[in-house]
């Protein structure tokens, strides 16, 4: 089963950062939302190997961390990053800054 485990996108910017590239790449996944308003939950620990969201299972790959998910999606949908190397470097720098 292909799935993306996230927290509520409005509450968890990390989840939103994982969800966006998956949607932009057009990956067919079941999105499983775990409510995070009350803080970390046992449900996250049960559903993900790292105990964090976002977490992606896709075609045999298991990927956690929003930036790793974005890179995985970009490998499947190369148009996610700019084609020009200078623009791509700037985009990756911005993504890394948001990730830090």
PLM feature spans:
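GST-like domain detector, emphasizing the conserved glutathione-binding G-site
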Residues: 1-100
